[in-house]
């Protein structure tokens, strides 16, 4: 493993960077504390060790253009301490702009050396190249950003191309750009950093704010998304397979290593409203051989390829809530996640669907949280798309212990699948698939509406309760919506597939993390 050293200059500022692949970090000191914190996300989420320091060159060098081949300046230089503002006690901040440019340039050049190292190793191993491009989205509470990165653009005109669309930086400030400062970090200089980094990296990068009203969250989400996209693009180069945000055709994420202990949980809950039993096993695919037992067998520890794992997933339902659409949604979620999920519920559906749907989601989320344990060594984040019919949904998931759920799905029908409100036919749009009633059959309205169908408000509540009780953050984003009668069923099943696929990637144990938690804090919130 070779070091990746670079030096860059802008005005009176010099930046020196070293990046090592898959090693612990050293120190980051740009002179702007929030920028230090953001660059540290590359270590936690990109799995690269970053050392970067900036300083003031008291006698400007003869040449001020950046170059990773330049030696450190001979002129006296005052370097900034990590996590300490360079202008403390001063009214002027003369070097802010140059710090963003020099730090971005030096870091980009250092990252380029890592790319060249991985590309060289991939060429030696003759891995069938999938390219060096990836998309990733990282959420942070109400915010999430999208990073689209290509480390080796085929079109030479796109080398160094950078598009940054993160404004407004928060919604609690006047003007169209949002907040001007985060600590002593000037938000207006954010594009300068990314443009300088991308130019030195020779990549093609688009950073886009999808959601977010908190400036800190928006910018941190962007840095995390880039870090994850960078790691995913490196992995594409290394093993010749796709990484990053999973497409609907990507299939399951195969387990990489055996967990230290079984990741299982079981809960039973009985109230005047519902009686529920839930069991989950994160590491045991649904095997056909288990069917006579009525439950899952213990995982043998065999590491399965994605193809073999997908072939072993049992497609028969083990979810019985009494609400047909809810059964379909949870079954699809479990299938896409590649986990074993057993749910049984007897509820007061003679009232409506509320108590059964809510209590199932709460209990399932609690089981998932318990099975995940301390989350040490997990990938932690997952991004995936799902589709059903003409609907396409993206799920962005973080097992962060920071509960938050957000969705823009257009759930504009009273019942999932568009059941006729008057119950005259009992048939939802699309042939009766939503209610469990055969097409053309005309039961009394009460038979249809009282608890046998899932209302759209409870579909939202199911995803919300599951996410919060799992102590995770999840965003659902509608990428395509037919909008035709009954479209809410297509959205529901596409969302379930996306959620499950994102979950399968988030719960995957990454041996490169050596049992550590993927967080710049070193731990997750309790």
Regions found by a protein language model. Give the residues of each.
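Structural preference for solvent-exposed beta-strand-turn elements
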Residues: 2-64, 68-70, 74-526
């Amino acid at each position: 493993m070779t070091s990746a050293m670079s030096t860059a200059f802008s005005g009176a500022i010099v930046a020196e960077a070293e990046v090592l692949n898959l090693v612990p970090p050293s120190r980051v000191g740009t002179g702007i504390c929030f920028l230090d914190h953001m660059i540290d996300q590359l270590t936690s989420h990109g799995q690269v060790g970053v050392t970067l320091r900036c300083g003031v060159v008291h006698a400007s060098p003869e040449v001020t253009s950046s170059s990773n081949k330049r030696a450190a300046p001979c002129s006296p230089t005052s370097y900034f301490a990590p996590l300490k503002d360079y202008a403390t006690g001063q009214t002027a901040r003369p070097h802010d702009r140059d710090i963003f440019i020099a730090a971005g340039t030096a870091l980009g050049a250092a990252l380029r050396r890592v790319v060249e190292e991985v590309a060289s190793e991939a060429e030696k191993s003759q891995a069938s190249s999938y390219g060096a491009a990836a998309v990733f989205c990282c959420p942070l509470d109400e915010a999430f950003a999208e990073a689209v990165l290509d480390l080796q653009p085929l079109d030479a005109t796109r080398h160094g191309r950078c598009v940054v669309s993160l404004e407004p930086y928060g919604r609690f400030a006047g003007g169209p750009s949002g907040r001007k400062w985060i600590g002593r970090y000037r938000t207006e200089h954010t594009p300068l950093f990314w443009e300088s980094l991308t130019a030195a990296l020779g990549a093609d990068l688009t950073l886009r704010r999808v959601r977010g009203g908190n400036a800190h969250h928006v910018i941190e989400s962007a840095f995390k998304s880039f870090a994850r996209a960078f790691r995913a693009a490196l992995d594409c180069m290394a093993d010749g397979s796709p990484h990053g945000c999973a497409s609907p055709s990507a299939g399951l994420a195969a387990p990489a290593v055996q967990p230290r202990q079984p990741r299982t949980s079981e809960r039973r809950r009985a109230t005047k409203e519902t009686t529920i039993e839930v069991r989950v096993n994160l590491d045991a695919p649904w095997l056909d051989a288990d069917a006579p037992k009525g439950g899952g067998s213990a995982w043998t520890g065999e590491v399965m390829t994605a193809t073999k794992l997908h072939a072993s997933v049992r497609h028969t339902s083990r979810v019985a809530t009494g609400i047909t659409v809810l059964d379909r949604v949870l079954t699809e979620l479990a299938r896409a996640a590649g986990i074993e999920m057993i749910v049984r519920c007897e509820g007061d559906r003679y009232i409506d669907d509320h108590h059964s749907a809510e209590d199932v989601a709460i209990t399932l989320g609690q089981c998932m949280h318990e099975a995940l344990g301390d989350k040490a060594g997990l990938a932690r984040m997952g991004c995936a798309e799902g589709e059903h019919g003409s609907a396409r949904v993206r799920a962005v998931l973080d097992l962060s212990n920071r509960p938050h759920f957000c969705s823009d799905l257009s759930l504009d029908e009273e019942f999932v699948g568009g059941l006729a409100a008057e119950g005259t036919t009992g048939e939802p749009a699309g042939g009766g698939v939503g209610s469990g009633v055969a097409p053309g059959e005309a039961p009394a309205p009460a038979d249809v509406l009282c608890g046998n169908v899932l209302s759209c408000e409870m579909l939202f509540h199911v995803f919300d309760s599951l996410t919060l009780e799992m102590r995770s953050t999840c965003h659902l984003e509608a990428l395509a919506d037919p909008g035709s009668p009954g479209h809410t069923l297509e959205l529901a099943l596409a969302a379930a597939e996306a959620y499950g696929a994102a979950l399968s990637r988030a719960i995957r144990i990454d041996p490169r993390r050596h049992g550590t938690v993927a967080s710049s804090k070193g731990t997750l919130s309790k």
